[in-house]
Amino acid sequence: MATIKDVAKMAGVSTTTVSHVINKTRFVAKDTEEAVLSAIKQLNYSPSAVARSLKVNTTKSIGMIVTTSEAPYFAEIIHSVEEHCYRQGYSLFLCNTQNDPEKVKNHLEMLAKKRVDGLLVMCSEYTQDSLDLLSSFSTIPMVVMDWGPNANTDVIDDHSFDGGYLATKHLIECGHKKIGIICGELNKTTARTRYEGFEKAMEEAKLTINPSWVLEGAFEPEDGYECMNRLLTQEELPTALFCCNDVMALGAISALTEKGLRVPEDMSIIGYDDIHASRFYAPPLTTIHQSKLRLGRQAVNILLERITHKDEGVQQYSRIDITPELIIRKSVKSIL
């Protein structure tokens, strides 16, 4: 691998001159500059990123810590983050924790050693222990993206209550009165607020919620599949079902199909998130859209602002608002 000394020797100049050409830090005669650039090209020379980072105190890199990158919703946010980082000239180090506190600690230490310019942390919930751990790395500019009501993090307000209300109201407006729900774990903020939106829409329409049609999953396709199979053992079935994310809707549709039932002819289903694959479900899924693209971009922009002003003292926490929108496809039928 070529070094700066090799470039200087081929161009017949000093290493200092080569450095000035690369970094554009001083005027260099045109002939000399061309000789240096020609030597760089011939030798396929690439300046040492490590040495450069030590000199300018920046690595043009960002670390991102996530619970998982497998879930489609989070994967689409991560894609948006990576794309926006790339466009801004930053590399992204992605670390999956799988909710393991030891992995979180090890990843933070590794990213600190790599001298990343900033950190994005994206988990659906945070314990006090995890917040205390993050605070011990507070010298690194950081955006902690939280869906919960935490006072010590940046807040992502995805208006889950409004989204749950919107999904249920659409089913009601299509004539459905017997409506079930597969929600997430109700001790989690996102799941609970979507369920509360469902409750509000049912209450406004003076419809009774059948407790047997309220099933709790964990936002995985297996949960939708298992919950639907439990639902299908009941004597009376709902005409419509609100699945609180798209992958649980996929599992529910799979279970229905195995029993010879059809969506929406035998049961209407509405999802939540509008993941990319939802338009290719059979049938294409009516769902609630959340802009993962905008969420990723805003998070990166907030972090870049903190990196730029990191020497100006404590930064105020930010709020990212994501407005839910109804996307009508073909998985809900009108029975008016």
Swiss-Prot record:
SMART domains: HTH_LACI. It comes from Haemophilus influenzae (strain PittEE). The keyword Repeat does not apply. It comes from the Bacteria. Disulfide bonds: none annotated. Signal peptide: none annotated. Consists of two structural and functional domains: an N-terminal DNA-binding domain, approximately the first 60 residues, and a larger C-terminal domain, approximately 280 residues, which imparts the function of corepressor binding and oligomerization. Pathway: Purine metabolism; purine nucleotide biosynthesis [regulation]. Residues 4-23, 48-56 bind DNA. NCBIfam families: PRK10703.1. This is HTH-type transcriptional repressor PurR. One of its GO terms (molecular function) is DNA-binding transcription factor activity. Keywords: DNA-binding, Purine biosynthesis, Repressor, Transcription, Transcription regulation. Gene3D superfamilies: 3.40.50.2300, lambda repressor-like DNA-binding domains. Hypoxanthine binds at Y73, K188, T190, F219, D273.
